Amino acid sequence: MKASELRAKSVDELNGELLELLKAQFSLRMQLATQQLSNTSQIGKVRRDIARVRTLLREKAGQK
């Protein structure tokens, strides 16, 4: 997900997105552990998306 798309979202929406991404990351890690994950680059993509969302949440918290 692009940062420009995330900037348009509210804090509540970003928190929801963060929760979904953390669940997806957990699921991917479990698939990796059980050798069911074929595309391991997904883990890195989700990790970077989590970082983007957390960065924007931090920016919005600083603006208040």
Swiss-Prot record:
- Show the Pfam families listed in the entry: Ribosomal_L29
HAMAP family listed in its UniProt record: Ribosomal_uL29 (MF_00374)
Provide the organism lineage as a comma list. Bacteria, Pseudomonadati, Pseudomonadota, Betaproteobacteria, Rhodocyclales
GO cellular-component terms in the record?
A: cytosolic large ribosomal subunit
- Which GO biological-process labels does this protein carry? translation
The name this protein goes by in its record: Large ribosomal subunit protein uL29
Question: Keyword Ribonucleoprotein, does the record have it?
Answer: yes
Q: Which organism is it from?
A: Azoarcus sp. (strain BH72)
The UniProt entry, under PANTHER family, shows: 60S RIBOSOMAL PROTEIN L35/50S RIBOSOMAL PROTEIN L29 (PTHR10916), LARGE RIBOSOMAL SUBUNIT PROTEIN UL29C (PTHR10916:SF0)
